Amino acid sequence: MTNWLQKRVRLSPKETALVFEGKEETFEEISEAVKQLAGKLFALGIRKDEMVALLGKNDRMTFLLIHALQQLGAVTLFLNNRLTKKEISFQLANAEVKHVIVADSLVDKVATGISYATLAETDYEAPALLETWDLSRAASVMYTSGTTGKPKGVVQTYENHWWSAVASVLNLGLTEKDSWLCAVPIFHISGLSIMMRSVIYGIPVYLEEHFDEEKITQLLESGKISTISVVTSMLERLLKIHSGSYHPNVRTVLLGGGPASKAVLEICKQRDIPLVQSFGMTETASQIVTLPPKDALNKIGSSGKALFPAEVKIADDGEILLKGPSITPGYLHNKKATEASFVDGWFKTGDIGYLDEEGFLFVLERRSDLIISGGENIYPTEIEHVISEYEGVKEVAVIGKPDDKWGSVPVAFIVAEETFDEAELRLICETNLAGYKIPKQITIVEKLPKTASGKIQRNKLKERHSM
């Protein structure tokens, strides 16, 4: 297939590609900057098919580097800038990285690497840029967030990114006014997929270095934004500071990282906020199941239906299985994990769920998070949904605690509001949950451990509290 950026420049050179810190740049301007960077990377020895790690931020330079590495045909290992030096070191070694490119403010996180400052001082050398891409080639590698066990390197091909973008546009549509606000990390699939969609669709990315709800609200009210990707915690922060709807041009608020609560859904409906819930993974190159706004209140808790042409089914043990061209070919240098993740061509998500009579998917739990108490299956998310309805709770996570009598019992960790009253919460639980599902212990914490994408890391809670 033709090189996406080069093709986009030929199609719409003067259209806006990137808006960062108020400055607009066209696809033509971005392409020229990318070529210059590619020449510098080439001069530093980076070649086609080499594994190159990128440790950056949500900024213009990192944005350009992602494109530059693709132009050279290198495979980009995206490093999470929130990781420790030790965690990063594991990924670099496991991926057998040839080069590391690192933002100046993050150089202490790696033993050695090419800093952005070094790049700026490097002389240009005419690079060998790829005019076409083999869709089966690896474009990127992202290590799983480690919600269970050691992180694994997820290989994402150009075909994976292409079909993810195609599936999304077939579902959400495309207009001349479209633009995508990216306040999620571009080292994560939710952010990188926005960049890929920008080039394939020919729409601008409004890139934000951090999620600032005040600034994001201003952008959503400006008329410049049509789509934004958020996780639940981001959405709740937006709803808290803004009591109305947004500009009519905002047509999609794409929610990932778990379904919204009934309270959030009702607020969005009252305020005419077009919330689109979705389910996706690093292994599926972003969303692969989506629930449109019209079904949100009728299908509370559902992630929706599989996007075209993906398929979803439920295994005999309740595990969600997926099939489609956006799904990873496997894990880097990990044949055992790859083989264990596929059965008859279907990808095993590790999530438990079900399909209702109309084919809507409901994700219940990670298999590893399931609590089995006295032979009863307890799904932490069910308890969390009940607890989160209480206005005194900001955030909640439920895990299983070993118990001599029952094997395991649920316990809750809560980030509380000032109005929190445990007695009131227990009454709510007793009214809405079977006795064995009621948390046997409630612990108030300042914050919950999360991945870069905003998913709560229950395994970290278990480690911290020796459960």
Swiss-Prot record:
EC category: ligase
GO MF, any single term: medium-chain fatty acid-CoA ligase activity
GO biological process: fatty acid metabolic process; menaquinone biosynthetic process
InterPro entries in alphabetical order: AMP-bd_C, AMP-bd_C_sf, AMP-binding_CS, AMP-dep_synth/lig_dom, ANL_N_sf, MenE
ATP-binding found in the keyword field: yes
Pathway: Quinol/quinone metabolism; 1,4-dihydroxy-2-naphthoate biosynthesis; 1,4-dihydroxy-2-naphthoate from chorismate: step 5/7; Quinol/quinone metabolism; menaquinone biosynthesis
Record's catalysed reaction(s): 2-succinylbenzoate + ATP + CoA = 2-succinylbenzoyl-CoA + AMP + diphosphate
Top-rank taxon, per record: Bacteria
Pfam families given in the database record: AMP-binding, AMP-binding_C
Function: Converts 2-succinylbenzoate (OSB) to 2-succinylbenzoyl-CoA (OSB-CoA).
Descriptive protein name: 2-succinylbenzoate--CoA ligase
Organism: Listeria monocytogenes serotype 4b (strain F2365)
